[in-house]
Regions:
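ADP-ribose/adenylate-binding Rossmann-like module
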Residues: 131, 256-304
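General beta-strand structural signal in soluble alpha/beta enzymes
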Residues: 105, 131-134, 155-158, 189, ...
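A short, aliphatic-rich alpha-helical micro-motif
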Residues: 124, 182, 250-251, 271-274
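Short, structured coil segments at secondary-structure junctions
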Residues: 99, 150-151, 207, 275, ...
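Glycine-rich phosphate/diphosphate-binding loop of Rossmann-like nucleotide-binding domains
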Residues: 74, 81-99, 157, 161, ...
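N-terminal ligand-binding/catalytic initiation module
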Residues: 1-155
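Short gly/ser/thr-rich secondary-structure transition/capping motifs
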Residues: 45-50, 237-243, 260-264, 284-285
């Protein structure tokens, strides 16, 4: 049984990867009176007088909402909120297993930015943090920005910042392994959506050489028509030599390739034109090039 079928069977068997468990056993009348009425009225009164006490008297301080609209799930695209639920459950399980943070999946059935923002804002008093997940660009940028302005709890778009942090850490190590100079790198990022743009900005802010963004049409250059606001913004600080062409053109002489796009877009022949290339092919669930193919093309370091 391959990994896909094994995972499907596991999900059928479990009927979901997370559950809500009470932290207070209710075995007696006194237990019930303390956890619920009438005793629960007192913490309610305390919070009503002092809002900050909600983080001490409820689970808010350790509870994160993992929220999607189902428009950019893995590499599957716009598959809808219900189909995004397995990923949201999985992320919640990771929060709990790796950080002991409780998390709750929420899938919003709307593609309207105002509706999504308002919905999340209205439920934000139930949580200590908001983790936005798998929301398509460019809508995701505005949603995160507005929620950060409106909410009094942390708001984090994982596909942007989580991915950027991990990629930067891996690239720093790859630079050491390949003995390249960080400030002189030519880095090609394929995929100019939420993840790609966030990675590009982060690497540029860290001082990584010349970052070249590519999308389905090829290299993105300042002044190009048809760019969305996120692409337009990063075009002013990337592609310093104003190169034009397709992905294959961008990879010639490149020190690093970072893929957050679609499967099988890169060949070993393209890798062979790179400069002792670092290849991070991260299209999910199938990468732009398989690791063995990248190595066969002469890649010096590979991540997937």
């Amino acid at each position: 049984m391959d990994i896909n079928q094994a995972s499907l069977q596991m999900h059928y068997d479990l009927h979901g990867k997370i559950e809500v468990i009470s932290r207070k056993k209710i075995e007696t009348r006194e237990d019930l009176s303390l956890a619920y009425t009438p005793g629960v009225a007192e913490p309610c009164r305390v919070i009503a007088k002092d809002y900050e006490q909600s983080f001490k008297l409820t689970r808010r301080s350790n509870l994160v909402a993992v929220i999607t609209d189902g428009t950019a799930v893995l590499g599957l695209g716009d598959i809808g909120p219900a189909a995004g639920m397995p990923v949201m459950e999985g992320k919640c399980a990771l929060f709990k297993e790796f950080a002991d943070v409780d998390a709750f999946p929420l899938c919003i059935d709307s593609k309207d930015t105002d509706t999504i923002v308002q919905t999340i804002y209205l439920i934000s008093k139930s949580f200590g943090g908001i983790n936005l997940e798998d929301i398509a660009a460019p809508r995701c940028f505005e949603i995160e920005r507005r929620l950060k302005e409106m909410c009094d709890i942390p708001v984090f778009h994982d596909d942007q910042h989580g991915t950027a942090i991990v990629v930067a850490a891996a690239l720093l190590n790859a630079v050491k392994v390949t003995k390249k100079e960080m400030g002189k790198l030519k880095i090609v990022i394929n995929g100019a959506g939420a993840a790609g743009i966030a990675i590009g900005k982060h690497l540029i802010n860290m001082g990584f050489g010349n970052v070249i963004m590519c999308d389905i049409n090829g290299i993105i250059c300042e002044g190009d028509e048809g760019l969305n606001p996120g692409q337009e913004e990063i075009s002013h600080i990337s592609n310093l030599n104003h190169e034009h062409g397709k992905l294959a053109d961008a990879l010639k002489g490149a020190d690093a390739f970072i893929g957050v796009s679609r499967p099988n877009l890169v060949t070993k022949e393209m890798v062979s034109t790179m400069n002792n290339g670092i290849v991070f092919a991260m299209a999910n669930p199938t990468p732009e090039i398989m690791p063995d193919e990248a190595l066969a093309g002469g890649a010096a370091a590979v991540g997937s």
